[in-house]
Design a protein with these regions (language model features):
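Substrate/cofactor-recognition hotspot
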Residues: 127
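Short cysteine clusters
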Residues: 124
């Protein structure tokens, strides 16, 4: 009977771990990445205090919002206000997490990566889909191979269409 209880405990422990890892990845504050030190960072949507701290810590000069222009939404208005107060450029791109960005928007993004004020902080809502596409596009622009670029999508998104 003790062996069966230990076995059940072990199975439940492993199941809990398997379920907890994805939640940890998506939990606020746990999705900030350095794509290229001093040049490009990616994250999930941050509140104003966390955004200000990240801007100051990494000396961010341009925040790239991949969620599109959303005046009137608190997260957007707070983000724009923080950037304005700190003298940081704020660029909006309306990218979908379900499809590849349209060619014009992708070209504008790549132009920003080449000619904009660095370092950049790109973000979407969760910091995975759209931010992964942005990070991978940046790395491909820098001449990094496709496999390394795919690494920006994490273990659950390796089938991303790049």
């Amino acid at each position: 009977m003790k062996t069966m209880a230990k076995m059940i405990g072990l199975v439940l422990g492993v199941a809990l771990l398997v379920l907890a890892v994805p939640l940890w990845v998506y939990f606020p504050g746990h999705n900030f990445r350095t794509v290229e030190q001093g040049v490009f960072y990616g994250s999930r949507q941050m509140g104003p205090d966390a955004l200000e701290a990240a801007i100051k810590k990494h000396k961010i000069k341009t925040v790239v919002n991949l969620r599109g222009t959303n005046p009137g939404k608190p997260w957007y208005d707070e983000e724009v206000a923080v950037c304005s107060r700190l003298g940081v450029a704020h660029e909006d791109f309306a990218w979908s997490k379900n499809r590849i960005p349209d060619p014009e928007s992708l070209a504008r993004f790549l132009d920003l990566m080449e000619n904009g004020r660095k370092p950049f902080l790109a973000h979407c809502e969760g910091g995975t889909h759209r931010t992964g596409v942005a990070a991978a596009s940046f790395l491909l622009l820098r001449g990094v191979g496709v496999e390394a670029a795919r690494g920006q999508f994490g273990p659950f998104f390796n089938d991303a269409p790049i």
